[in-house]
Amino acid sequence: MDPTRAPDFKPPSADEELIPPPDPESKIPKSIPIIPYVLADANSSIDAPFNIKRKKKHPKHHHHHHHSRKEGNDKKHQHIPLNQDDFQPLSAEVSSEDDDADFRSKERYGSDSTTESETRGVQKYQIADLEEVPHGIVRQARTLEDYEFPSHRLSKKLLDPNKLPLVIVACGSFSPITYLHLRMFEMALDAISEQTRFEVIGGYYSPVSDNYQKQGLAPSYHRVRMCELACERTSSWLMVDAWESLQPSYTRTAKVLDHFNHEINIKRGGVATVTGEKIGVKIMLLAGGDLIESMGEPNVWADADLHHILGNYGCLIVERTGSDVRSFLLSHDIMYEHRRNILIIKQLIYNDISSTKVRLFIRRAMSVQYLLPNSVIRYIQEHRLYVDQTEPVKQVLGNKE
C-alpha cells in the first residue's frame, strides 16, 4: 500500500533509524528465485528434475508410486482443486481431515470414475443469509484479543515432490473487493504453475487498517467481511487475514509480510513434503502495476523496505491495461537488482474493474452487477456503504485502485 497515506508519514531519509523485523532474516526461508524456467535454467536442461534435498534417514522407495503421480500431473493442468466440502450446508456431517486430504489427492491426480469437468465445474448454491457461515469456513474476529491466524484452507502437505511451497499475499484497501481482485489470484496461480517450480498452498487478502488515510475507505470490519463473502463460497484456497486491519496504526507492507512469515514458518514450521519432512514456505506479495510504479516515486518507499520485500520475499505483478511494468523494472535500480524474485503477470483478458469506479456507480445509483460478487453487493446494500460518501474528482479520474 502507498506509505504516503499513513497519518504519521515522513519521507524516508538515510539517517532514519531502522526498526528490525520481529524475526531475524535468517528465519525467512531462502528458496530459489521465482523467475521462469527459461531464465533460471539458461545453462541447464529445462527437463532436468528439480529435487528437494532430503535427509539421508529417509530411504528411497515407492518409485512406482511417484512415477504414477507424475504421469497424472502431466495429464492434468496444475491447479488447486475445488474443495466441494465448502458448499455443504451447516447441518452436513463434518468430515475428518483425512477424508478431506484423500478427496483432494484423488481430485489432484485423477481417478477412473471422476472427470476434471465434474470436479472443477461451477457449483450451484443458494445464499439464504449473508451471516450463514459455510461448512469448514473460519471468519475473522473484530479485535486483536480474539484474533486467530486463518489456516483452514492452507495446505498441510505438498502434492508435488519436485516443487517448493508458496503462499500469495495481497495487501490493499478492498473497498469494496471486486472480481479483478479475485481474478488476480487466479492469474497468479496460472503463471506460477506454468512458469515456476513452486506449488501454491494458499492465498490471503490482507485489508489495510482504518488509519490508512484515503477517502472512500469503509470501516475495516466491513471490508474484511466483504472479502470473506467474496471468496468463502467461491474459492477453495483463498482466505482473509484481519491482522493488518486490526492494527491501531498504519502497518508497512514489509511488516505485514513478516507477520505471515512468523505465522506460517515460525509458528507452524512451514509445510510437510511428501516424505513428511517440513520445509519453509516462500511468501510473495501480489500487487498491481500501479503499486509497483509507486515504488519508483521518490520519498515514498524506504529503500530498506524495498530490499526487504523484493529480496527476502518477492513480488508477483499483474500488469494493468496500458502499463509497461517491464520498462519500469529495467529503469528502477532496486527492482532491477531483485528482478529474479519478481514475476510479471500479463493479463490475457484485460480487466480494468476498479473499486473507485464501483463506489462512484453506487453513489450515482447505477448498477454494479457483474462487477463484484452478489454477496458483496447485498452486503453493501444492507449496510448502505458508499452511498453518502464523496471523493475528490482527481481520485475518481485517477482510477488506480
Swiss-Prot record:
Name of the gene: NMA1
Species for this entry: Saccharomyces cerevisiae (strain ATCC 204508 / S288c) (Baker's yeast)
Molecular-function GO term, any one: identical protein binding
Co-factor binding comment: Divalent metal cation.
GO cellular component: cytoplasm; nucleus
Note from the entry: Present with 5130 molecules/cell in log phase SD medium.
GO biological process: NAD biosynthetic process
Family: Belongs to the eukaryotic NMN adenylyltransferase family.
Superkingdom of the source species: Eukaryota
Binding site for NAD(+): 173-174, 253, 288, 290, 301, 320, 351
Annotated protein name in UniProt: Nicotinamide/nicotinic acid mononucleotide adenylyltransferase 1
Pathway named in the protein's UniProt entry: Cofactor biosynthesis; NAD(+) biosynthesis; deamido-NAD(+) from nicotinate D-ribonucleotide: step 1/1; Cofactor biosynthesis; NAD(+) biosynthesis; NAD(+) from nicotinamide D-ribonucleotide: step 1/1
Cited InterPro entries: Cyt_trans-like, Euk_NMN_adenylyltrnsfrase, NadD/NMNAT, NMNAT_euk, Rossmann-like_a/b/a_fold
Cofactor(s) listed in the protein's UniProt record: Ni(2+)
Assigned EC number: 2.7.7.1, 2.7.7.18
Residue list for modification Phosphoserine: 91, 95-96, 111
Keywords: ATP-binding, Cytoplasm, NAD, Nucleotide-binding, Nucleotidyltransferase, Nucleus, Phosphoprotein, Pyridine nucleotide biosynthesis, Transferase
Subunit text: Homotetramer.
Basic residues bias spans: 52-69
Role played: Catalyzes the formation of NAD(+) from nicotinamide mononucleotide (NMN) and ATP. Can also use the deamidated form; nicotinic acid mononucleotide (NaMN) as substrate to form deamido-NAD(+) (NaAD). Key enzyme in both de novo and salvage pathways for NAD(+) biosynthesis. Predominantly acts in the salvage pathways via NMN.
Family matches, as PANTHER family: NICOTINAMIDE MONONUCLEOTIDE ADENYLYLTRANSFERASE, NICOTINAMIDE-NUCLEOTIDE ADENYLYLTRANSFERASE
